Amino acid sequence: EEFVTAYTPYQAEISQGLLQSIFEYQTMICELTGMDVSNASVYDGATAAAEAAAMCRDRKRGTICVSASVDPKTISVIRTYCFGSGAPLVILPEKDGLTDMESWNAMDTSSIACLIVQTPNYHGLIEDGASIANAVHNSGAKLIASCNPIALGLLETPGEFGADVAVGEGQPLG
């Protein structure tokens, strides 16, 4: 028998087994992503990306930027979140299937809170996380990396290349 849920239990004293499972999942995700902390209480990868973008916003930097090489379904969810909150959304173009960082460097990034990239991206290509992180951080924004947890066994982790937030879909794990 298997129990799967996107919900966090409200009564910790009667949910120790579920809490133990969530703790072990979060520990594994931290190891895979190279990040210090993990959350397990969002519905899916697209929602996680939208929540991460909302987390990065502040009064001076409220614009969300998403690479065009991110899964269109994820972009759609982020667009919905931005519409509901009134956050401006910018889609950064792609070039040869990868995030076009020349476009990033040419734009005014003073109001951009974060850039969301996906690696491997929607086209199956691996983004250059370190150079993207460098450019994004030099502009004062945060980098959100959306990644496939299975691919993280082979690829440089978001923590290694300097992402501020890592998000992903749990479905590839089974």
Language model: regions and residue ranges:
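Conserved N-terminal alpha-helix of the aminotransferase class I/II PLP-enzyme fold
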Residues: 1-48
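Conserved PLP-enzyme active-site core in the AAT-like
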Residues: 47-50, 54-174
